[in-house]
């Protein structure tokens, strides 16, 4: 095989791998981040990524407060959405609007997208109504979330 052809073939095969490994987060989580910023504009979305027992990766034990309970409900909502055929909430994108702190899931979403959008919308609204306790950020999960 011609060396130039090998080089092109290698570039085509390697490029998609690089694109996937460099993606910062699934697109749905990017949308969820934007929903949070819509309802809670004065706080970084990152403040919710490692809060309590349920906000962030995984979840176990008793929620530490109302905000953590919002995340527990969101986790359960995603679990319900996964029951829809071929629905993967962390990767499902959807259509929505944010207008002056109000979130609306659009009507053109399929069943999975509508469910995931509503999960994210309700969580973002819940975050806006729950007090944020700095002492519950980055807690010791083993000690407090059994």
UniProtKB/Swiss-Prot annotation:
Pfam families this protein is in?
A: Phospholip_A2_1 (PF00068)
Report the subcellular localization.
Answer: Secreted
For activity, the cofactor(s) needed are:
Ca(2+)
Check the record and name the SMART domains matching this protein: PA2c (SM00085)
Keyword annotations: Acetylcholine receptor inhibiting toxin, Calcium, Disulfide bond, Hydrolase, Lipid degradation, Lipid metabolism, Metal-binding, Neurotoxin, Postsynaptic neurotoxin, Secreted, Signal, Toxin
- Which EC number(s) are documented for this chain? 3.1.1.4
Residue ranges the record assigns to the propeptide: 22-27
Q: Which GO terms describe its molecular function?
A: acetylcholine receptor inhibitor activity; calcium ion binding; calcium-dependent phospholipase A2 activity; phospholipid binding; signaling receptor binding; toxin activity
Q: What does this protein do?
A: PLA2 catalyzes the calcium-dependent hydrolysis of the 2-acyl groups in 3-sn-phosphoglycerides. Is able to suppress the acetylcholine (ACh)-evoked current mediated by alpha-7 (CHRNA7)-similar nAChRs in L.stagnalis neurons (IC(50)=37 nM) and to compete with alpha-bungarotoxin for binding to muscle- and alpha-7 neuronal nAChR types, as well as to AChBPs.
Its recorded name reads Acidic phospholipase A2 CM-II
- Identify the species of origin: Naja kaouthia
Upper classification of the source organism reads: Eukaryota, Metazoa, Chordata, Craniata, Vertebrata
